[in-house]
Amino acid sequence: MAPGGAASRLLTFSMSVDLPSSDPAVAVSVVVPERNEAENIVPLIQEITVALDGRWDFEIIYVNDGSTDATAAQLAAVMKQRGNLRQLQHAVSTGQSAAVRSGVRAARGAIVATLDGDGQNNPAFLPDLIAAVEKGGKRVGLAAGQRVGRKDTGFKKFQSRAANAIRSAILRDGTRDTGCGLKAFRRDVFLIMPYFDGLHRFLPALMRREGYEIAYVDVIDRPRRSGVSNYGFFDRLWIGIMDLAGVWWLIRRKKSTPVVTEVTSDDD
């Protein structure tokens, strides 16, 4: 039995085994990392379905990051009605980056789209993000949402603007807003990224590090439907400083990969 007393399909895989490969029958995997957002599950899944139905063959992967509310039971109930809904569970909360990575590793679509589980990210913008990745072909690794008309408090907006300004100045990633959960990217490219806690905040810089272009899509934010944020000011501040230093180091230490040609005995 899953937490919450509901039967649920669980996916378990070791970090050391081969990953599931992309499935041609699934074009897009929508990954939703969430913790204690049970009340937001049904309306968000409905909105995702309205946005993508008839345009792509897609699956929705909810990553339940150690929720202590009715999340598991709510997802199990919806899964009985929607065959394209999957639930992954973390036994304990490990954070958003780990939740996103679990979802991407389990995804069957060649393109992965992400959005937060609190309802602030509007799924209506998912088609624009996915189309930007498709249009970009092998050049574009990531389509990133950039929020306009944010519905957060004045203090939270100030925090975000200051953090984005500092990050952009140091990393020179050309990105106005890395905190938006609305993103779409190629699964294969994401999986070559160096993994660390906080990865999701630095995807544009790390994609550029690997030589990929970024497409930007303006999105309109919404107020949180219910629940409370899982982040505090000092959590963001100190962890963000350490992560920023680490990403700066990774970029500085990047080496160009030489062209490698194998010479065989048949070559003249």
State each model region's role.
Residues 2, 8-26, 165, 172-173, ...:
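Hydrophobic helical membrane-anchoring modules
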Residues 27-29, 59:
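Cell-envelope/extracellular polymer assembly enzymes that use nucleotide-activated donors
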Residues 32-46, 66:
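Active-site beta-to-alpha loop of glycosyltransferases that engages the nucleotide-sugar donor
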Residues 39-43, 69-73, 98, 177:
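Residue-level preference for short helical/loop micro-motifs built around acidic side chains
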Residues 47-57:
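Short, acidic, metal-binding catalytic loop of nucleotide-sugar glycosyltransferases
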Residues 56-66, 88-89:
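Short beta-strand/loop segment that forms part of the nucleotide-sugar
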Residues 64-73, 119:
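A conserved acidic beta->alpha catalytic loop
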Residues 84-106, 111-114, 120-198, 223-249, ...:
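Acceptor/aglycone-binding surface of glycosyltransferases and processive sugar-polymer synthases
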